[in-house]
Amino acid sequence: MPTVLSRMAMQLKKTAWIIPVFMVSGCSLSPAIPVIGAYYPGWFFCAIASLILTLITRRIIQRTNINLAFVGIIYTALFALYAMLFWLAFF
């Protein structure tokens, strides 16, 4: 058994540098988009796009006469889902 543990310890030493890299990976500048001379954060555009897409989804649901329970929770979840998908896709 000591050989297995020593091999694991050697592998840990080889990959120990990865842990600090992941810890500081979020320390970069926030993505800002210049619009007419002002810089707006990326999450702002994701929220606007998400709101528009949620309203389009709401319009489609209304036109198809689908009755939803817990409408507030559903639309809030759709808004969050769309915002995160935009963030994942574009940032």
Swiss-Prot record:
Tell me how this protein sits in the membrane: Lipid-anchor; Multi-pass membrane protein
Give the record's family classification.
Belongs to the YtcA family.
Signal peptide coordinates = 1-26
Q: Where is the lipid attached (S-diacylglycerol cysteine)?
A: 27
Annotated InterPro entries:
YtcA (IPR031381)
Primary location: membrane
Q: Where are the transmembrane segments?
A: 33-53, 70-90
Q: What is this protein called?
A: Uncharacterized protein YtcA
A Gene Ontology cellular component where this protein is annotated is: plasma membrane
Which PROSITE patterns does the record associate with it?
A: PROKAR_LIPOPROTEIN (PS51257)
Q: Where in the cell is it found?
A: Cell membrane; Membrane
Covalently attached lipid (N-palmitoyl cysteine), positions:
27
Keyword annotations for this protein? Cell membrane, Lipoprotein, Membrane, Palmitate, Signal, Transmembrane, Transmembrane helix
Gene symbol of the encoding locus: ytcA
